[in-house]
Amino acid sequence: MMHNKSKAIQDLYPDELAHCYGCGKNNLDGYQLKTYLVGDETIAHFLPDEKFTALPGSVYGGLVASLLDCHGTGSAAAFVCVQENINLNEVETIPVRCVTASLKVDFKAPTPMGVELKLRGKLQSIEGRKIWVDMTLSADDTICATGEILAIKIKD
Ligand SMILES: CCCCCCCCCC(=O)SCCNC(=O)CCNC(=O)[C@H](O)C(C)(C)COP(=O)(O)OP(=O)(O)OC[C@H]1O[C@@H](n2cnc3c(N)ncnc32)[C@H](O)[C@@H]1OP(=O)(O)O
């Protein structure tokens, strides 16, 4: 799905920091999740294939958690860029990379297979190198999981 409001955050990570299985553009075997800044929130989409099955017809929770993980670190990087007045459409790379210190996931409803999942992120707060982001993962109009991440901006 295309968004015209920003480049994907993960496509702006420097090459040497872009091998993450969940979101690295340089990991051809990975999920290559793409997080976009749209207004004051972040959006990503992912369509799981059937190898990620938990019970037949539903998606494995570990995948749900890893999507929230990578959307969370990407969202954190985007919100730091906003705070630092970095326009994501005017740069080739961003000088910001965040890693997960803590991730909380609440599974609210079974995540159905065969539906494009939508992830949304909202900034909760930034305090120095610590960024908290609240997230949802939805299928159609149902919130299947919520997440809260504490991401840490890695040192220069
Ligand atoms: C450098 C290579 C980068 C590669 C990028 C690829 C990332 C791909 C995305 C991921 O999937 S990340 C994978 C899962 N995460 C990890 O493997 C991270 C493992 N943990 C660490 O490497 C370090 O603990 C971490 C970088 C997160 C923090 O270490 P630092 O030495 O940079 O910072 P520090 O320990 O001083 O913590 C900074 C602040 O965060 C707080 N903090 C850290 N971990 C916390 C935690 N778990 N819960 C609550 N607070 C936490 C800590 O108390 C402190 O607060 P204050 O500044 O107020 O004192």
Which role fits each region the language model picked out?
Residues 16, 31, 40-42, 61, ...:
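A generic structural signal for short beta-strands and their flanking turns/coil linkers
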Residues 28, 98-100, 130:
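Short, solvent-exposed coil/turn segments
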Residues 75-118:
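Hydrophobic beta-strand-centered segment that forms part of the acyl-chain substrate-binding groove
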Residues 43-79:
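A conserved, well-ordered hydrophobic junction motif at loop->secondary-structure transitions
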